Amino acid sequence: MSFFSTAVSFLALPFATASYRNDLRRTLLALGADIVLALFVLVGATLVTVLPSLPAFDVVTDYRPKIPLRIYTADGALLGEFGDEHRDFTPIGEIPPVLKEALLAIEDARFYEHSGVDYRGVLRALVADLSGGFRQGASTITMQVARTFFLSREKTVKRKLTEVVLAYRIESALSKDRILELYMNQIYLGQRTHGFASAARTYFNKRLPELTLAEAAMLAGIPQNPAKHNPAVNPLRAKARQELVLKRMLQLGKITQAQHDEAVGQALTIGHRLQFEAHADHVAELVRQELHAQYQGDTYTRGFNVYTTLDKAEQNAAYDAVRRNVLAYDQRHGYRGPEAFVELPDNAEERDEAIERTLARHPGSDNLIAAVVTEVSAKRVRAEPASGDTLEIKGDGLRFAARALQANAKMDLKIRVGSVVRASQDGKGRWSISQMPEVDAAFVAINAEDGAYRALVGGFDFSRNQFNHVTRAWRQPGSSIKPFVYSAALEKGFSPATLMNDAPLSLPGGADGQPWEPRNDDGFDGPISLREALARSKNVIAVRLLQAISPPYARDYLQRFGFDAAKHPANLTMTLGSGSVTPLQMATAYAVFANGGFKVSPRLIEKITDARGNVLWQAPPPPPRQDEQRVIDARNAFIIDSMLREVVSRGTGAQASQRLARSDLAGKTGTTSDAVDGWFAGYAGNVVAVAWMGHDQPKSLGGREFGATLALPIWIDYMRQALSGKPISERKPPPGVSVVDGDWVYDEFKGDDGVKTLDVEVSPLKSIFDAIRKAFGG
């Protein structure tokens, strides 16, 4: 008897004879027995086919999620993250109730009632499918955990049976809260994020406790289909799913009508990627390389947390300073024209596709947005960025590119419909035409006492150029090397008061057999003290000084500061910066003057912890310093410091003291021949910082550009933050120095053993006065 005929017979049962009813009962009993037998056979087949192939169960009982490498500042700001899966493991007790309720409402409302498989849910889903009512998947949270950890998404009977068996095993081994904890930390939620804590940071830049009801509902709607309901990729579908979650929460009594309506109406700002709290891509890459060298493949999955020595506020100040002043330089040297051009089709859909394809090749650079021009006139430009919005640029926002808007502009300069331009927005929401700079820059700051990095910016844009100019760029230092030659001269009896002749100098060794004639930017001044010569960066005096102490001696002396002797020629051009240094070398070298004569080794990592916060490595405290560890005499460091302070107070670095209004700033500008490189290296207190600007392929930065116009503004902008609230640093003279002729000198060089003049004719009258002063002990 078929199932259909049996059903008909059952409906006719009240009208049947007693004999017929007995026959029907026997038939139904037999059918029931067949069903039971079939179920036993099915269960048996399941046990035979599924149980032997069940995967190892410790993956959930001993859960070890893949947690990425994370890098932080010393004050806990996230700098970078490396790993295939973005995940923050969060214990169930720290997950806010609103998020748990939103998730269970849409995924498994009877989670705390069933035993892993919700048969009522299966029937309800079937009825809903047939009736067109609210559709809820038949898979429970526990079944999804089984699928996520053990199985694929293939649609086979065996896979589904295995999922059911695993669900029961999971329920028997783990508590409900533990199962939910596994699910909420493991589930994929789009944008390479796994788990709700990571998704909250990625989409809303928030921690879980900070989520609103609307945001929690948005996240809870993602698991069913992360591609379809990704709010960053499909905002309309994600919104519809969010409203479904809120409707379900209302039906279950988890929220009130007022809460529902408020959440539905809340406008959400959706992020597209993980947001970091400080701009330090080059730092993050340095740390990644160091960790990978030690831990290899485990680097990106074991949840290492690396705390650097950086300060968040100072790092962001350094980043902003580099970006601001590179763009300022670029503005000074004019608009070069659009980055590219694309023909825009008349068809709207084809036009949008053309814009999207084009802008994919021109990614944004922080506040420099790439956009395709859709409308242009001399007074207004409209452009479309990757977001699909329309930017309107007018008034002062067009000034930088005014020549490119003229009707007779050259084709490679002209802005027209289809041009790819860069735009930036000011604090008042006004857009301006800008451009990606060709020049690059770098900045590094360290603690003079222990070498700890305070800030590091390896270049203008890490996504465009991963090369770390701080640690890897060997560039000519220009005049910023001069203080080290002066330091060497102090050991030979010179002092800041030593008079030298700032007059034309002709030496053999020039190009094409011609004499070499070093020059000053500001002409010649005749007899001048070394203090004045350094303050005004006199090239001829620096050459005469090196000539007096000998290039080989000076080159050997430079090694005390950490310079590589092989990269500095043992000839007179060395004093003008013809050798090669990195910005990091310059920072550690200037730290010797700042800390009284000790060489420091730069260090970046303060400590490393595992995912549970256990300390794996901690930087040892710096050992107490001993005088015998000095690389230069304390007196030498003190005197050079006094000279470098004068450079900043009234010399080539005077802009710093004027803008920062401090008397404890010390440093030196540096400009190479033809202004190929611009430098400023200096310090205040225990903060040592070096700024550099130049092209990767060396070429002139411009005829009227110097270290003071290129690098010094970066240094000033950073120091404004780094020195905020810090007292003025005073230096006390160490034992063994005296004031002679109005300036400091080593005690052993107070008399005739010191160098009073060099290449300067002393008048007879001055000789008489000197003799009288000496006779009376002056």
Residue ranges of each PLM-predicted region?
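Non-catalytic, structured segments within soluble enzyme domains
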Residues: V43-G44, V48, G132-P385, L545, ...
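Mid-domain, small-residue-enriched loop/turn segments at the edges of structured enzyme/sensor domains
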Residues: G513-P518, S550-T588
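Short, well-structured active-site flanking segments
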Residues: Y112-V122, H194-A197, T256-Q259, F467, ...
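N-terminal type II signal-anchor transmembrane helix
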Residues: M1-Y72, R110, L130
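Active-site SXXK
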Residues: L103, M249, A318, A378, ...
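Short active-site loop at a secondary-structure junction
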Residues: D88-G93, R403-D412, M436-A441, R464-F484, ...
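A penicillin-recognizing enzyme superfamily signal
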Residues: T308, K312-Q315, Y319-A321, E350-A354, ...
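Conserved catalytic neighborhood of penicillin-recognizing serine enzymes
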Residues: S131-K155, K206-P209, R273-H279, E449, ...
